[in-house]
């Protein structure tokens, strides 16, 4: 019997995805000192192109080099040199070598800007993130409140970056409005207390997102896929609720976007890492954000929906597509170890992807830390650091941990901490001031 994941999907713009599996965005940290694409990115994405997934979405490509979530982000910020264009073309070509789609995730780190690069992030309001779990060793600072002039500039930067992505050969873009980054923080009433047209009531808080989508659409035309990634909920008391998210998604559904990816949480909350209900600590073993997405699923009429977060079993994937109005399945961490996991699922060589997060080696003398929130953050952040390390090794054609046998908490934290520090120290020609990189604005 044919799996549901094998079925094609036609997008509203007319593009066709050959199956229902997507490698979703994961930050790679592989750019050069000028935040340009590299041969390592080409190697990595050529391998993922052969994974069997019909769609690859790149990690954060920043539209402003001053505000990056990692020093190794690629950036499309302003006029691109001939060298930059050629590097992007090479990346796009490698990422589509197997006939799949590759879309660029465009984003702005906002108040979650890596403090090693820039201590002064940018936010809708000057409100500091309460706990940046993803940067557990980095202090967070109150961001600068974005002005109307800067809002206009950001809209133009997203639109221009979308234009470049189309010109160099990528097959679509995704606008990142989840996980607490700039566009997500505009939606979050805890982060956005503005009193102008971009704050206050819900339709004002999602105004910037709609303006960016419309500007990008005018630039790339009607036949180029545009996706949006959004939280089903922030899982923060007083933050964006699932009901509000459903209202936003209804507005997006009228904007003729081509794929809506549903995720959840932010670096202020463990839901992004652990797959638990943030309010009652209830374990959710698969499809972390399905329950919080119910209202969205009942609201959307025109836009295909992709669900991301903890989906591992083939039976679950097929059930989501058959019975829950899910059109695409988003996969991330498993493809850092089992690169050809989608192909194996389609061929029924396997029936479940590995759950590497269950294999973390927490030293015995530190296990008591898991009692506390801080310890839980470190424990769950370790799997992301393991993904980062594997991504680096895969990109360099080096041996990597395909079975999750080397997830040692302390070793991986130290190794990646050094890597990130060196990467931030190596940046060139960027005007910002951080804990490592110290040019003046």
Tell where the protein language model's regions lie, with residue ranges.
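Flavin-dependent oxidoreductase catalytic cores
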Residues: 1-441
């Amino acid at each position: 019997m044919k799996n549901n994941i094998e079925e094609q999907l036609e997008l509203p713009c007319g593009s066709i995805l050959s199956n229902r599996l997507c490698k979703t965005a994961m930050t790679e940290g592989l750019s050069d000192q000028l935040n340009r694409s590299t041969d390592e990115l080409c190697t990595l994405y050529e391998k993922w192109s052969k994974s069997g997934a019909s769609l690859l979405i790149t990690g954060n490509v920043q539209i402003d080099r001053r505000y990056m979530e990692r020093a190794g982000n690629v950036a499309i910020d302003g006029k691109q040199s001939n060298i930059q264009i050629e590097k992007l073309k090479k990346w796009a070509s490698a990422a589509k070598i197997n006939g799949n789609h590759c879309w660029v995730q465009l984003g702005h780190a906002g108040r979650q800007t890596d403090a090693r690069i820039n201590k002064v992030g940018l936010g809708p309001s000057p409100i500091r993130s309460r706990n940046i779990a993803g940067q557990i060793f980095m202090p967070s600072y109150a961001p600068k409140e974005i002005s109307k002039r800067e809002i206009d500039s950001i809209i133009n930067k997203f639109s221009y970056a979308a234009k470049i992505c189309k010109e160099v050969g990528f097959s679509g873009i995704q606008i990142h409005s989840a996980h607490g980054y700039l566009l997500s923080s505009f939606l979050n009433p805890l982060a956005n207390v503005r009193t102008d047209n971009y704050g206050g009531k819900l339709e004002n808080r999602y105004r910037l997102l709609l303006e960016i989508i419309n500007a990008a659409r005018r630039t790339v035309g009607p036949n180029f896929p545009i996706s949006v990634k959004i939280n089903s909920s922030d899982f923060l008391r007083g933050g964006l609720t699932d009901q509000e998210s459903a209202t936003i998604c209804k507005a997006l559904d009228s904007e003729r976007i081509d794929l809506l990816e549903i995720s959840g949480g932010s670096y202020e909350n463990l839901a992004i890492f652990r797959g638990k209900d943030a309010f009652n600590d209830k374990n959710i073993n698969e499809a972390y954000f399905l329950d919080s997405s119910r209202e969205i699923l009942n609201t959307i009429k025109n836009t295909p929906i992709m669900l991301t977060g903890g989906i591992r079993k083939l039976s679950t994937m097929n059930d989501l597509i058959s019975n829950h109005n899910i059109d695409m399945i988003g996969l991330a961490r498993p493809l850092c170890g089992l690169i050809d996991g989608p192909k194996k699922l389609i061929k029924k060589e396997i029936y479940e992807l590995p759950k590497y997060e269950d294999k973390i080696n927490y030293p015995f003398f530190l296990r008591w830390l898991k009692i506390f929130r801080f310890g839980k953050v470190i424990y769950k952040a370790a799997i992301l650091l393991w993904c980062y390390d594997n991504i680096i090794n895969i990109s360099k054609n080096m041996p990597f941990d395909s079975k999750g046998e080397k997830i040692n908490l302390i070793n991986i934290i130290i190794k990646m901490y050094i890597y990130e520090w060196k990467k931030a120290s190596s940046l060139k020609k960027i005007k910002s001031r951080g804990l490592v990189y110290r040019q003046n604005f």
